[in-house]
Amino acid sequence: MKKFAKLFLLVAAALFSANASAELKVGYIEMSQVLQSQQAQDIGKKLQNEFSSRANQLDQLKKTVNDKRTALEKDSKKMSETELRDKTKQVSDMAIDLERKQRELTEDINIRKNEEMKKFQDQVNKAVGVIAQADGYDLIVYNSVAYVSKKINITDKVIAGIGK
């Protein structure tokens, strides 16, 4: 009797799942394609413009540090021990300052990138929600899927819906 009940439940579950999947509308979004969209590229350009002046200043400071190091190496034999020590410390302090400013710039860029990507992800999620409601999707999945039919790939719709 127990075997019959288990078999009955198994068959019923299989029939129910086959019937349920026939009514399920599924969509797929390829996030790598979304992240290569014009909207995502605009974020990169915006951040580049925002931080370009600081990056240029750091490039100039790096050139100055390198020039001073080169001059110090070249002129070190002509300097007194005290002068050499003072100039070496000066160059070392400049190099430390440069490294600190580079770290700060990297941190600031990462913070702003995370802020902008969160806004972008919110726009993507909003577009997905609008498309899901409008087109009657029951399930929309992102990324790692073994196989995706072109008929359920809604990536282009999502990209078109971002920011609307």
Set out the residue ranges of the language-model regions:
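Amphipathic alpha-helical segments
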Residues: 23-144
